[in-house]
């Protein structure tokens, strides 16, 4: 038996640092070149960490970063250690759950520690979060020319080539493309009564599909998603699709797969090491295949439109864009209008226009099922203003303040685009006393704005009356910004408002919605490109 006064060798289950100290000398021996290289790497990492810990003059405060990967280092940790890293620690009240959901909650919590404007690092990219309305407005409205660019990060650049509307860089080309796109969509009814019949027609198919379920519980997502996607199809392709159409189902599958894969945490590492995108396995390979499938699908549609184009009678957005391309070729050899740009704009319209509106409608159905008393008030307002037989119209909005207030309250609580789309500064500036360097990524936390107790009384309660005055008339609040603000405000805002009102009122006019017995829906939302409700079932009864 060994003397109790002598140190004992560690057991196999001892901590690895203890085992390392007792390792045989030969195990740790390095040749001079290897030792020098190891020391050089350690010195570089420590030096990098030390430099970043030095508070650059005026930069917003924030958590200390890791070497090389910044504050994104927790992704590299084993799952059991992630909860102890900075993103998983609850700051004060609220917080995010252990499954990693609730990025908007996390950033709101960190704002309570570091202030409404704080910073962190993803790799070498400086990210600044804006958690309150005043900082968001000052940045995106009062300093719009500086804060309206998009981040030049590898993953976005690879996927979009800097084209389209949503992720394109701010400048003359973007302004031309957005102006043309917006005016063309208006030509085909965006924000006008002329689009109303298409939305009401689409609801007939929604109603038909829902009635097939009788009094059995069903997931409303596929039906609502099909309807919203078809309205975009009407604007872009000049036609709607039957829900069983193989081409339509293929397109929705491509979009769904693209959104799902893009949310894989490993893909975010591409922004640190861009060559990872070309790895021949895992989500990297799958994303490249999805990109290829979507490209073939949309370019075939554009090709078909080009071959059948009637110059005297353009039928949809693609026709109008192709005509404009030809005009620009004659008048402007350096025009930014081409079929490649059209491809990315169509992708933007579908991804941005479908996902957001679909999830907003699903949140509406969920909240109505949870609050039958509010649902009953809406039924009463519909009966009083519209009746049981006439289809709703946008002209009814002014006479239906409670219904409109309810939609707004759902949008406030759900905030389906909680962090907007990231912005980037095009030059160095000062925001509320903080220095914001050129190229800084800006995250406007719209979710935090909509839950700010300094603005909203009992912000976590569902209370539509907060949008009504003493006479029951609608109040427009400047702090209500579900579509963002500034030069990058959502281009499809008018379409989304039309769809939400007409579809929601049509659903409420036709059905009463309840949750299955003992159902306990989760209201935290499922974070992705948008904040979607967790899958839920509902039961309808015809009114």
Swiss-Prot record:
Catalytic activity, EC: 1.14.14.80
EC class name: oxidoreductase
Keyword Ribonucleoprotein listed: no
Chain positions recorded as heme binding sites: 490
Cofactor: heme
InterPro entries associated with the record: Cyt_P450, Cyt_P450_CS, Cyt_P450_E_grp-I, Cyt_P450_E_grp-I_CYP2D-like, Cyt_P450_sf, Cytochrome_P450_fam2
Keywords, in A-Z order: Endoplasmic reticulum, Heme, Iron, Lipid metabolism, Membrane, Metal-binding, Microsome, Mitochondrion, Mitochondrion inner membrane, Monooxygenase, Oxidoreductase, Transmembrane, Transmembrane helix
UniProt GO MF annotations: arachidonate omega-hydroxylase activity; heme binding; iron ion binding; long-chain fatty acid omega-hydroxylase activity; oxidoreductase activity, acting on paired donors, with incorporation or reduction of molecular oxygen, reduced flavin or flavoprotein as one donor, and incorporation of one atom of oxygen; steroid hydroxylase activity
Catalytic activity line of the entry: an omega-methyl-long-chain fatty acid + reduced [NADPH--hemoprotein reductase] + O2 = an omega-hydroxy-long-chain fatty acid + oxidized [NADPH--hemoprotein reductase] + H2O + H(+); (5Z,8Z,11Z,14Z)-eicosatetraenoate + reduced [NADPH--hemoprotein reductase] + O2 = 19-hydroxy-(5Z,8Z,11Z,14Z)-eicosatetraenoate + oxidized [NADPH--hemoprotein reductase] + H2O + H(+); (5Z,8Z,11Z,14Z)-eicosatetraenoate + reduced [NADPH--hemoprotein reductase] + O2 = 20-hydroxy-(5Z,8Z,11Z,14Z)-eicosatetraenoate + oxidized [NADPH--hemoprotein reductase] + H2O + H(+); N-[(5Z,8Z,11Z,14Z)-eicosatetraenoyl]-serotonin + reduced [NADPH--hemoprotein reductase] + O2 = 2-oxo-N-[(5Z,8Z,11Z,14Z)-eicosatetraenoyl]-serotonin + oxidized [NADPH--hemoprotein reductase] + H2O + H(+)
Gene3D superfamilies per the UniProt record, alphabetical: Cytochrome P450
Function statement: A cytochrome P450 monooxygenase involved in the metabolism of arachidonic acid and its conjugates. Mechanistically, uses molecular oxygen inserting one oxygen atom into a substrate, and reducing the second into a water molecule, with two electrons provided by NADPH via cytochrome P450 reductase (CPR; NADPH-ferrihemoprotein reductase). Acts as an omega and omega-1 hydroxylase for arachidonic acid and possibly for other long chain fatty acids. May modulate the arachidonic acid signaling pathway and play a role in other fatty acid signaling processes.
The family this protein is said to belong to: Belongs to the cytochrome P450 family.
Name the record gives this protein: Cytochrome P450 2U1
